[in-house]
C-alpha cells in the first residue's frame, strides 16, 4: 500500500509540474505582473472566492456580455457554452485581467488578445460540439 501511495504521489506531482511548465512559458503566466501578486494560477484558479458552478475552482470574474455567434447557414445565435465564457472573461475586453478573488480590476487585455463580442464572421465557437465529450463526435 505504501508503494502504491508513493507511486500515486509521484504521478500526481509529475502531472502538476507538467501543467505548471506549460503555463509558465505561455502568455497566460501573469506572475511577472504586479497585480497578480506573483502568483501563476491565482488570477484564474483558487479555492477561495471560487465560482464552483463554472468548474476548475474558477476565481476570475465572468463576463456578462451578450455575444453574437456564427451559426452556419441559419445566421447567428446567442447560445454560448460555459467553457467559452471562461476564456472570454478576459478575451472579450469587458472584464479586467486583474478582476479576480472578488476584486474589480483595471488592467484590460490588449488589442491582439481582445476578441470582442461579435463572432458572426468566425468559425463556430461557444458550442457544445466544439468541445465534444466522450462518446460524442463533432
Q: Which residue stretches match the model-derived regions?
A:
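C-type cytochrome heme-c attachment and multiheme electron-transfer modules
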Residues: 7, 11, 17-42, 46-138
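Positively charged n-region of N-terminal signal peptides that target proteins for export
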Residues: 1-4
Amino acid at each position: 500500500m505504501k508503494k502504491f501511495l508513493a507511486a500515486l504521489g509521484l504521478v500526481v506531482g509529475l502531472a502538476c509540474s507538467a501543467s505548471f511548465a506549460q503555463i509558465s512559458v505561455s502568455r497566460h503566466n501573469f506572475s511577472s505582473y504586479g497585480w497578480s501578486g506573483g502568483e501563476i494560477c491565482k488570477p484564474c484558479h483558487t479555492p477561495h472566492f471560487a465560482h464552483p458552478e463554472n468548474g476548475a475552482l474558477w476565481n476570475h470574474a465572468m463576463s456578462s456580455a451578450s455575444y453574437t455567434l456564427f451559426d452556419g447557414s441559419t445566421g447567428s445565435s446567442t447560445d454560448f457554452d460555459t467553457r467559452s465564457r471562461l476564456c472570454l472573461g478576459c478575451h472579450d475586453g469587458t472584464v479586467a485581467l486583474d478582476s479576480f478573488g472578488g476584486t474589480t480590476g483595471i488592467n484590460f487585455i490588449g488589442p491582439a488578445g481582445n476578441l470582442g463580442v461579435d463572432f458572426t464572421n468566425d468559425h463556430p465557437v461557444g458550442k457544445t460540439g466544439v468541445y465534444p465529450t466522450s462518446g460524442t463526435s463533432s
